[in-house]
Amino acid sequence: MLPVLISETNESELIIQDLALRLGLDLLMRGEEEKELQLADDQYYLVRGKKKSHLQIGLKGKQKPILCNFTDWSNNKKKSNLLRCMKGLPSDCSVVDATAGFGRDALELATVSDSVVLIERVPWLHYLLQDGIKNSTEEYVLSLVSKFELIQSDARDF
């Protein structure tokens, strides 16, 4: 099930309609939320916020938003299995994350490599990755996401 785009910004309707078209999503305009509330407890929404965009289930705000939060993830000091597998790689290597998803693996890969190519085929997920990169502000996180090359494509075509 594809998410539905909702905008919490003051951008023009044309800009939001263009974004929905580029992402291949239906658009729910402001004021239409009320009629959707009863129908939408299990519907995913891509919310274009004023500062950050996120994915959420339902419109009632019961669930935590799902977003690319590279700053929070960088503070997780627990060593992952992915990093254990990458042990011994030369530090000047380039890595391809062919299924970028929300970018958590790519962030870890950036700690042990010179560059990371993130390939994501799903347009709205690619959009959330761009938003997460744009909203990274801490110096350490910026040093990691600056290694990213984000590509919207099917990895089989890359």
Residue ranges of each PLM-predicted region?
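Short, surface-exposed connector motifs at secondary-structure boundaries
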Residues: 1-2, 114-116
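S-adenosyl-L-methionine
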Residues: 1-94, 119-158
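Gly/Ser/Thr-rich loops at beta-strand to alpha-helix junctions
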Residues: 10, 101-104, 124
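Hydrophobic alpha-helical packing residues
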Residues: 20-23, 109, 133
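Residues at the starts of beta-strands that form the adenosine-phosphate
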Residues: 94, 114-115, 147
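Conserved SAM-binding loop of SAM-dependent methyltransferases across substrates and taxa
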Residues: 102-114
